[in-house]
C-alpha cells in the first residue's frame, strides 16, 4: 500500500489548516518539516510539502533542498499558501522555480492556495512587507485588480481569511492517483 506523508511549515496558521485538512482526507501522517530525516522520508512513497509564502519565499523550502537526494526517488507534491492569488498576469512558476531545487523542479507537482493574515499579529518587518504589498495592490490599474485584491484592500485592518478547502481537490486527486497505482501493483 502506498504510504503518504505530509510535511508542513506554518507561520500564521493557514498552512497548518490546509495540512490538517489534506492529511485527514488522505488519511496520512502530518509532521512539522523541521523534524524530517532522510531515513524517515525514505519510508514513504509520496511526500507532500506545504509552506506559507512570505516575500516570494516558501517558508521551510530548505526541506526540499536538504532532502533532495531522497526526494528524487519519490512522488513529491508541493503546495504554497499565500495571501495573493496567481493568475495569467502573475505566474506561480517563478515562485516555485525560486524555491524548489532545479534537480527536482520538473518532477514535482505544485499547487497554490489562498491563506489568511492578521495584521495585528505581524512583527514590524512583516508589517512593513505587507504594507508594501498592499500599496502595490492599491496602485494597480482597476482592470488588473483581482477579486482577492479588492478583499485585501477592503478588509486588511480586520484580518483576512481566504482559506478554501475546495481548492485542494486537484492536489487530493493527484495524491490519490499515486496511491491507487501503487495499490494495483
Question: What residues fall within each predicted segment?
Answer:
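FMN-binding flavodoxin-like domain, especially the glycine-rich phosphate-binding loop
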Residues: 46, 56-185
Amino acid at each position: 500500500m502506498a504510504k503518504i506523508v505530509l510535511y508542513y511549515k506554518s507561520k500564521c496558521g493557514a498552512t497548518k489548516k490546509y495540512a490538517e485538512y489534506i492529511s485527514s482526507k488522505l488519511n496520512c501522517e502530518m509532521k512539522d518539516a523541521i523534524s524530517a530525516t532522510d531515513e524517515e522520508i525514505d519510508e514513504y512513497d509520496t511526500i507532500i510539502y506545504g509552506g506559507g509564502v512570505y516575500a516570494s519565499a516558501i517558508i521551510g523550502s530548505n526541506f526540499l533542498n536538504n532532502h533532495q537526494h531522497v526526494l528524487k526517488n519519490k512522488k513529491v507534491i508541493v503546495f504554497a499558501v499565500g495571501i495573493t492569488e496567481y493568475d495569467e498576469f502573475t505566474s506561480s512558476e517563478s515562485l516555485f522555480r525560486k524555491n524548489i531545487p532545479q534537480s527536482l523542479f520538473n518532477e514535482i507537482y505544485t499547487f497554490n492556495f489562498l491563506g489568511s493574515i492578521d495584521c495585528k499579529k505581524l512583527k514590524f518587518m512583516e508589517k512593513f512587507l505587507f504594507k508594501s504589498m498592499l500599496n502595490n495592490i492599491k496602485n494597480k490599474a482597476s482592470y488588473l485588480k483581482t477579486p482577492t485584491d479588492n478583499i485585501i484592500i477592503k478588509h486588511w485592518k480586520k484580518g483576512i481569511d481566504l482559506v478554501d478547502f475546495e481548492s485542494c481537490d486537484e492536489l487530493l486527486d493527484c495524491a490519490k492517483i499515486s496511491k491507487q497505482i501503487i495499490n494495483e501493483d
